[in-house]
A protein has these predicted regions:
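Short, linear, compositionally biased motifs with a strong N-terminal bias
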Residues: 10-11
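Surface-exposed strand-loop-strand hairpins of Gram-negative outer-membrane beta-barrel proteins
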Residues: 33-61, 217-220
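Outer-membrane beta-barrel pore domains
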Residues: 37-39, 52, 96-100, 116, ...
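Sec-dependent signal peptide recognition
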Residues: 2-7
């Protein structure tokens, strides 16, 4: 299926010259970063930010190229290609899908799409490349979605469009996401904007991999048990009151199954809301779920919860945003010494300025305070504070 996604993207680019309706764009995202705290998760640590203990550095966060190819009024192809210095391949795909949505003159409309795409879960990550128009770093919830979740399958949607409001219901069936949950269990929540590509790997903490004599990397988009997962969602949108979203997700993985690595049975409920009050944008989301692996008679389950509240204000070329996150995990294990618990909070403040269409500058400060018992096993203090300040320059075309 992942090879099919590549072929879909290639067919889109090949057909671009003959297309009558091609749109899209791209960007190069540079960062000047000052960060302190634990070693970053991408470097094998237990840190809670993308750049961890890097200190002062200049980074290419990513470069992306995305496009819509409208083959007809009903049929659309979308692809999002990305380069990021630490990814496994020179160019990777974040999404690639085809959508069929017949023209409807009635209040009812339906659509179906197939390929690889993000589940309809985010209130904040609404821009291309699983990015947010408000901050550089997404919430803990949406950082995890970008790292471990992708719908590689088919989603059907039904919409009812009223004069002032809209109702949507979607159901999806997917595969190749049997490892989703391993990062939550082995590392906990992380506030990061590094999205895992379809052909990329996910880094696990060195402290976890070494005792198991296993690799420190996992391929999150892997099919192990040949059993499809699914999700179902409902959304209500009112032009004056805002939007309310509900999603239930279950990858239906068999926690006993093994094929180079074990499957993780991951399921959760997500509730999100967005509105505008006196010119202030309010975004909020809550997630609660668990993930289970059972390589022997003794299973291992990690419960996880997270929530955030974001307030944003736009004035001309400027945007200002402040967000508060809370998050927690707790493992259920027969061996008390193997149980891991985590809780933490994060505060994010960002100011962005877009003086011209092709340039956006963003200054962001992030503070994460977390307590994780796992650190004690590696002679680290269980309570840690991570700081990260970034000046981002996004060049868009």
């Amino acid at each position: 299926m992942r090879k099919a996604a590549i072929l879909l993207a290639a067919s889109m680019l090949a057909g671009a010259a003959a297309a009558q309706d091609l749109s899209g764009g791209g960007y190069i995202d540079l960062r000047l970063v000052n960060s302190s705290g634990e070693r970053a998760a991408i470097d094998g640590g237990l840190g809670k930010t993308r750049y961890g203990d890097d200190g002062n550095a200049i980074h290419l966060a990513e470069a992306a190229l995305y496009g819509n190819l409208q083959l007809s009024e009903d049929l659309l192809i979308f692809a999002d290609l990305r380069y990021e210095p630490s990814q496994r391949t020179a160019v990777d795909l974040l999404e690639s899908y085809i959508r069929y949505r017949p023209l409807s003159l009635s209040p009812w409309r339906w659509s179906i799409k197939a390929g690889a795409f993000f589940p309809p879960i985010s209130e904040e990550n609404t821009a291309p490349g699983w990015t947010s128009p408000w901050t550089l770093t997404p919430s803990a919830i949406n950082g995890w979605v970008g790292e471990e979740l992708r719908t590689i399958g088919t989603e059907g949607k039904v919409e009812w469009r009223g004069e002032a409001d809209r109702l949507e219901a979607e159901v999806a069936v997917f595969g190749w996401n049997d490892v989703a949950g391993v990062a939550i269990a082995d590392r906990g929540w992380v506030l990061t904007d590094r999205v895992t590509g379809l052909f990329d790997r996910l880094r696990l903490p060195n402290a976890v991999a070494a005792p198991r004599h296993s690799a420190a990397w996992r391929e999150p988009f892997t099919e192990i048990d040949n059993t499809p997962g699914w999700y179902a969602g409902l959304s209500w949108k009112h032009e004056d009151w805002g939007r309310l979203d509900l999603l239930y997700y279950d990858n239906e993985a068999d926690p006993h199954a093994f094929q180079h690595e074990f499957a993780w049975r991951t399921k959760f409920v997500s509730v999100g809301a967005s509105t505008n009050i006196g010119g202030v944008t309010v975004l909020s989301q809550v997630m609660s779920g668990d993930t289970t692996i059972q390589p022997s008679d003794e299973g291992y389950t990690s419960d996880f919860q997270a929530a955030y509240l974001l307030l944003g204000y736009r004035l001309g070329d400027w945007r200002v945003a402040a967000r508060a996150d809370v998050f927690a995990t707790e493992s259920q294990n027969k061996d008390p010494d193997a149980r891991i618990a985590e809780h933490g909070t994060a505060q994010t403040v960002a100011v962005s300025w877009q003086p011209i269409q092709y340039l956006k500058l963003t200054l962001e400060g992030l503070r994460v305070a977390s307590f994780r018992t796992q650190r004690l096993a590696y002679n680290l203090a269980p309570a840690q504070i991570d700081h990260q300040v970034q000046l981002g320059a996004k060049f868009m075309f």
